């Protein structure tokens, strides 16, 4: 099935990181995969129809859902958006994050972005280009260092 899992596989690997974010139903309020899944078909259609479009965006941040809970246990997502741009015969991905914990999340975030780029390129018969990754606050915590 193409339906995303909640919680996903990374949760199974790192309970110590993710348990604090589970809601009362033993799920996350959302996963990136769920938000990507809801938008990916529109991006694929747009790229096929208009390869040079500048509108191929996947938004992880949903202002109507996430702003309502700022300051509480739920938070604005660290990943904000993915933008796909076809330039010089290749599909590039511009990935914007407001914040990233380099020790516990960076590797998973980069892997997901790269796999997403490969998937969209394959579905649209485009060559894979560059991944541009912008992070406003890249940080680590003392608890994660030996």
Model-assigned labels for residue ranges:
Residues 1-146:
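Terminal, non-catalytic protein-protein interaction segments that mediate quaternary/complex assembly
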């Amino acid at each position: 099935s193409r339906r995303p899992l909640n919680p996903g596989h990374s949760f199974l690997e790192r309970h110590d990181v993710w348990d604090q974010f589970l809601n009362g139903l033993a799920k996350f309020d959302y996963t990136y995969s769920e938000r990507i899944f809801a938008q990916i078909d529109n991006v694929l259609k747009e790229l096929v129809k208009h390869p040079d479009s500048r509108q191929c965006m996947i938004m992880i941040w949903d202002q109507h859902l996430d702003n309502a809970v700022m300051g509480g246990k739920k938070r604005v997502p660290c990943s904000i958006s993915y933008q796909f741009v076809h330039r010089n015969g290749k599909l590039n991905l511009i990935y914007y994050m407001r914040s990233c914990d380099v020790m516990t999340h960076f590797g998973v975030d980069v892997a997901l972005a790269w796999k997403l780029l490969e998937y969209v390129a394959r579905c649209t018969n485009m060559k894979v280009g560059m991944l541009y990754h912008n992070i406003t606050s890249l940080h680590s915590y003392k608890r994660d260092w030996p």
